[in-house]
């Protein structure tokens, strides 16, 4: 079996025990086809494992598993005023049911939305980043999220470099001041992912060469950022609905790295206290 990549917080260790090696193997097992990265040939190895993301309702774990998915990206944020999303935020009970079914969980934060009852989160500046990071961390830990796991913060629109530099970057620096860079991830188009990495406001995956970048196909021009850990291949819209799981339309994400920020791989690795 090939050596498994360690989370960055554990890189300082010169060696790992057999017990720790087993823990990493178990943590990765939920990704199904990602077992190929551990030298385990399977028929599914040709296709990447997939995670779904959704907001409308909590989809039963067994239905997610039966549909062939390896886990979820779930919200550690509240519903906007005037809306009531059943999957926002993820709860401890639901998270436990996903884990019991052998599914992995990745955290993301999105409260506001373009044209919604609350503005896009990234427009809230440094102070907004501080507040959003504190909310995200409280909801993440309340649901059992890994102490060293990243939270992916959302830029859900097409922005240019000037807007990134003047507005979004300040928001991310506010987030960093609370969580630290290593627990900060980004969701957005390819440009946003690349800018976040270049400006040093997102952390690194335990998979060499990968960053905490969850890229959507939107605003990406059919390009995929080589350092991304997740790629949102299917974006469910009214004109192009995604597949249904448990009666609800979902977005579908390819897992591009064995360490995509899943809770169970970062459960016991602290990277400093949130402020």
Cite the ranges covered by each PLM segment.
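Aromatic-lined carbohydrate-recognition surfaces of secreted/lumenal glycan-active proteins
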Residues: 181-195
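N-terminal module-boundary/linker segments of secreted carbohydrate-active enzymes
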Residues: 23-27, 31, 44-71
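Active-site cleft segment of glycoside hydrolase catalytic domains centered on the general acid/base Glu
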Residues: 157-179
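C-terminal region of N-terminal signal peptides and the immediate post-cleavage residues
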Residues: 16, 32-47
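Functionally critical loop-and-helix segments that line ligand-binding/catalytic clefts
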Residues: 48-57, 61-64, 193, 198-275
């Amino acid at each position: 079996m090939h050596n498994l990549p360690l989370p960055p917080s554990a890189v300082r260790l010169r060696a790992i025990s057999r017990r720790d090696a087993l823990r990493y193997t178990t943590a990765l097992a939920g990704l199904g086809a990602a077992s190929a990265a551990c030298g385990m040939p399977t028929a599914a190895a040709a296709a990447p494992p997939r995670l779904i993301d959704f907001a409308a309702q909590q989809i039963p774990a067994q239905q997610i598993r039966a549909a062939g998915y390896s886990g979820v990206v779930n919200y550690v944020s509240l519903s906007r005023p005037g809306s009531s999303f059943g999957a926002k935020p993820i709860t401890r009970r639901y998270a436990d049911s996903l884990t019991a079914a052998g599914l992995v969980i990745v955290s993301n934060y999105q409260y506001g939305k373009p044209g919604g009852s609350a503005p896009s989160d990234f427009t809230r500046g440094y102070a907004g980043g501080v507040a959003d990071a504190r909310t995200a961390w409280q909801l993440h830990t309340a649901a059992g999220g890994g102490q060293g796991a990243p939270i992916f913060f959302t830029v859900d629109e097409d922005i240019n470099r000037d807007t990134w530099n003047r507005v979004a970057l300040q928001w991310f620096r506010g987030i960093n001041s609370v969580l630290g860079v290593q627990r900060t991830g980004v969701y957005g188009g390819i440009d946003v992912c690349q800018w976040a990495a270049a400006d040093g406001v997102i952390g690194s995956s335990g998979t060499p060469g990968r960053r905490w970048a969850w890229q959507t196909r939107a605003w990406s021009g059919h390009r995929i950022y080589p350092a991304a850990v997740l790629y949102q291949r299917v974006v469910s819209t009214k004109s192009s609905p995604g597949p249904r799981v448990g009666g609800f339309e979902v977005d579908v994400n390819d897992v591009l790295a064995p360490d995509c920020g899943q809770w169970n791989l970062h459960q016991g690795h602290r990277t400093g206290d949130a402020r």
